Amino acid sequence: MVVTIPQLQQWKRSGRAIAVLTAWDWLWASLLDQAGVDLILVGDSLAMVALGHKNTLPLSLDEMLHHTRAVCRGVQRALVVCDLPFGSYQESPQQAVRSASRVLKETPAQAVKLEGGYPAMVETVTHLVRAGIPVLGHVGLTPQSVHQYGGYPQQGKSVEAAERILSEAIALEQAGAFAIILEHIPADLGLTITQKLSIPTIGIGAGPHCDGQVLVTADALGLSERQPPFAKAYANLRETILQAVQEYCNEVQTHQFPGSG
């Protein structure tokens, strides 16, 4: 069954949780799709996990399009969403429509994601949805604002901050977002937002009560050197890969591989 936006929204109503992971190329996308991931996010986190940048800000729209095309070639079932990178949508709703239109025209992705729920961004989401472009919202910790935060601290800890994030989520739903990512907020706030919205919430460090969960695949598989505090590693692939490559190098260097036969 091919996953669609209406299907995700039906799953919220039925209580079936949504599994989301990130991918940045054909290989990872094909593995995630075969494993049953519901939504594959071509996240701008690829700037860090695939391209070696210190944060997500250097990534360009052309680079996102390149990686999204590669991801889509590996997907048969999952819904694919492309992150709009920093600087490709904040200037105006018109800029956002141009950038998002390129995503839908130049890749097979079905939707875009952007960060923020402040009034200007809500207006942008309204324009995108009116243009027929599905939007995945994102509130709480928004990594493209890393320099404003001075890092990646939890958001929504004060009453005022929690009320603001809740208001942003409601405004994004009213603007037409089909789902919203809640990142690095207290679990009780994640529950409140999930109960208030009729669209799915996808949590990352937002507690167990969201309608779905997302992790960066490098974190979920134990490839990252440093894990976020809310991530869970389901494997230790970093160590497995290091050991395998070291064994290969040793066998080549000592003339054990390929054998004499």
Curated annotation (Swiss-Prot):
The alphabetized list of GO BP terms reads:
pantothenate biosynthetic process
This enzyme catalyses: 3-methyl-2-oxobutanoate + (6R)-5,10-methylene-5,6,7,8-tetrahydrofolate + H2O = 2-dehydropantoate + (6S)-5,6,7,8-tetrahydrofolate
Q: In which pathway does it act?
A: Cofactor biosynthesis; (R)-pantothenate biosynthesis; (R)-pantoate from 3-methyl-2-oxobutanoate: step 1/2
Chief site of localization: cytoplasm
| Residues the entry annotates as binding Mg(2+) | D44, D83, E115
> How does this protein assemble?
Homodecamer; pentamer of dimers.
Give the family this protein belongs to, as stated in its UniProt record. Belongs to the PanB family.
Full protein name: 3-methyl-2-oxobutanoate hydroxymethyltransferase
Species whose genome carries this gene: Cyanothece sp. (strain PCC 7425 / ATCC 29141)
